[in-house]
Amino acid sequence: MKRTFQPTVLKRKRTHGFRARMATKNGRATINARRAKGRKRLSK
């Protein structure tokens, strides 16, 4: 049986990376929410 999680750095960065987050309004909201909460890591 194939496992469901097959990690790929490029895919991860394109979907969850900082620049991907900053590209959309909701993504920026996510970053701001994590900043307000005081997260050490804002994105992957």
Swiss-Prot record:
One of its GO terms (cellular component) is ribosome. GO terms for molecular function: structural constituent of ribosome. Keywords: Ribonucleoprotein, Ribosomal protein. Gene3D superfamilies: 1.10.287.3980. Pfam families: Ribosomal_L34. GO terms for biological process: translation. PANTHER family: LARGE RIBOSOMAL SUBUNIT PROTEIN BL34M, MITOCHONDRIAL RIBOSOMAL PROTEIN 34 FAMILY MEMBER. HAMAP family: Ribosomal_bL34. NCBIfam families: rpmH_bact. Belongs to the bacterial ribosomal protein bL34 family. This is Large ribosomal subunit protein bL34. It comes from Vibrio atlanticus (strain LGP32) (Vibrio splendidus (strain Mel32)).
